[in-house]
């Protein structure tokens, strides 16, 4: 029997992003709202929290985008989700993280996921993983990770494996960063989102496997490595668009449910295809353990420390 809703939802609160990653599939081209109204966002959170007994408790909400930190109310929204008893998670490119914001998120944000597709400035520029300034450096990533962890926020990393970063070796960085999990996605094609020039980024299954195997040794450092093929990503995520609708990506496109605030979260979710077995198989349920510091994460002479902008 299909669950009422998945135990984790990806709540895409905003379309805008300060980066321009060319293979991004979260542009929501058919979405008629740029930023989710806060009243709708909080209503969706309330409905989601009310169903946690049907899936897993505490249920988890991933705040995503676009770049969710561009929303002027993202800290307030995370705090509201936390007040409902939800596990809170933020997926960000990390460029807007500051000590001031991390101070506000301390005790409210359970999991910080930073998307890092390359450690090479030239590759990041070619991908579009930059804004008007230079891409983040290795030392800047490590500084953000350390400052989050010392505030009691667990850190996870995401990487999209594609044609440009396929031969990169990130082992030393991951060992130093010590995320609780490192998720590796094979670059995913979504029709009408990133399909126009997808061949420029696409890789073969065996190339993805080689990238994963090259990095298996990070597991000996206590990092959980989680690879996801395209097949594992289709139909296994509870995705909510900025206009408050579930998205069905099971057929390689985005098909939208009715608005949750109009029909209710259970009825809206019934309109999309979701595989709970697939969700579990890809490791969708896992423990988040906070740590205040990690001796493996030290800023070395090779990567001189840079302070965050307050």
Swiss-Prot record:
GO BP term (any one): defense response to virus
Listed InterPro entries: Aldolase_TIM, Elp3/MiaA/NifB-like_rSAM, RSAD2/Viperin_antiviral, rSAM
Record-listed E.C. numbers: 4.2.-.-
Cofactor list: [4Fe-4S] cluster
The keyword Nuclease appears for this protein: no
Gene3D superfamilies per record: Aldolase class I
Protein's recorded name: S-adenosylmethionine-dependent nucleotide dehydratase
Species the sequence originates in: Coraliomargarita akajimensis (strain DSM 45221 / IAM 15411 / JCM 23193 / KCTC 12865 / 04OKA010-24)
Protein's gene: vip15
């Amino acid at each position: 029997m299909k669950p009422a809703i998945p135990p984790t939802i990806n709540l895409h609160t905003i379309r805008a992003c300060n980066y321009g990653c060319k293979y991004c599939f979260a542009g929501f081209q058919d979405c008629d709202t740029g930023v989710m109204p806060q009243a709708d966002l909080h209503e969706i959170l309330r409905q989601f929290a009310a169903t946690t007994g049907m899936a897993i408790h505490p249920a988890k909400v991933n705040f995503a985008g676009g770049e969710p930190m561009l929303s002027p109310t993202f800290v307030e929204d995370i705090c509201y989700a936390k007040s409902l008893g939800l596990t809170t998670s933020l997926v960000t490119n990390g460029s807007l993280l500051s000590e001031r914001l991390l101070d506000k998120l301390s005790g409210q944000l359970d999991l910080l996921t930073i998307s890092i597709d390359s450690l090479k400035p030239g590759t990041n520029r070619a991908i579009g993983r930059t804004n008007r300034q230079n891409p983040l450096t290795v030392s800047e990533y490590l500084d953000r990770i350390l400052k989050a962890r010392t505030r009691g926020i667990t850190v996870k990393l995401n990487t999209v494996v594609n044609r440009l970063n396929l031969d990169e070796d990130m082992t030393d960085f991951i060992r130093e960063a010590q995320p609780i999990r490192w998720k590796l996605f094979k670059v995913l094609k979504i029709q009408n989102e990133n399909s126009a020039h997808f061949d420029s980024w696409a890789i073969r299954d065996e190339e993805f496997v080689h990238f994963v195997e090259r990095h298996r040794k990070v597991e000996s450092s206590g990092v959980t490595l989680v690879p996801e093929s395209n097949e594992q990503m289709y139909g296994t995520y509870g995705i909510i668009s900025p206009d408050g609708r579930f998205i069905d990506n099971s057929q390689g496109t985005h098909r939208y449910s009715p608005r949750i605030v109009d029909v209710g979260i259970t009825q809206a979710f019934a309109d999309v295809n979701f595989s709970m077995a697939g969700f579990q198989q890809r490791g969708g349920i896992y423990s988040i353990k906070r740590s205040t510091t990690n001796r493996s994460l030290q800023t070395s002479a090779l990567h001189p420390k840079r302070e965050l902008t307050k």
